[in-house]
Regions:
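Dinucleotide-binding Rossmann-like beta1-alpha1 core, especially the glycine-rich loop
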Residues: 46-126, 135
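Glycine-rich FAD pyrophosphate-binding loop
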Residues: 21-43
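Short beta-to-alpha linker loops that shape the active-site pocket of alpha/beta-hydrolase fold enzymes
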Residues: 33-35, 123, 155
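Aromatic/hydrophobic pocket-lining residues that form π-stacking "cages" and hydrophobic walls in ligand
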Residues: 16, 71, 103, 154-155
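N-terminal Rossmann-like FAD-binding beta1-loop-alpha1 element of flavoenzymes
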Residues: 2-29
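Helical element adjacent to the flavin cofactor pocket in flavoenzyme catalytic cores
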Residues: 138-157
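Short, glycine/charged-enriched secondary-structure capping and boundary segments
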Residues: 20, 42-45, 62, 103-105, ...
Length: 157
């Protein structure tokens, strides 16, 4: 007899199982594949988003920045690969540059640390392989990448 049955052991199922394992519960995880992370999780981009996209005031906006912080700690606790590499959103014309300003304002309201707009020269100093027609970039230094398979395995174990 189990207290909780979790169907699927991708990143959501494994995370749920890991969290529930911290309580006095008997947890059963059912997975149709022969290993964890064989569904949608295996095809994800492994990006831990900074939090400038969600519209301010939404649940996603409220949780995104805090979730990013917690993911770094979780990966450290479980010895899972985590690397803060930052991210760019590129603008190729003035209209797109205005959108970067909207994302910057949104990100600041959401509490994203270190977010800023770079001109083309500053962006190329950081990433010399950018296209020649880039006019600006939104830089989010808190964006990161993880090992999603390693995370699922560590949480499932």
């Amino acid at each position: 007899m189990y207290d909780v049955t979790i169907v699927g052991c991708g990143v959501v199922g494994a995370s749920l199982a890991y969290t529930l394992s911290q309580y006095r519960l008997r947890v059963l995880v059912l997975e149709r594949e022969n290993d964890v992370a064989m569904g949608t999780t295996k095809a994800n981009s492994a990006i831990v988003h900074a939090g400038y996209d969600p519209e301010n005031g939404t649940l996603m906006a409220k949780l995104n920045v805090r979730g990013s912080e917690l993911m770094e700690q979780l990966c450290s606790d479980l010895s899972v690969g985590y690397k803060r590499i930052g991210s760019f959103v590129l603008a190729f014309d003035e209209e797109q540059k205005k959108h970067l300003e909207h994302l910057l304002e949104n990100g600041v309201r959401n509490g994203v640390p270190g977010l800023r707009i770079l001109d083309a020269e500053e962006a190329r100093e950081m990433e010399p392989n950018l296209a020649e027609n880039v006019v600006a970039a939104l830089y989010a230094p808190s964006a990161a990448i993880i090992d999603p398979w390693g995370l699922c395995i560590a949480e499932a174990e």
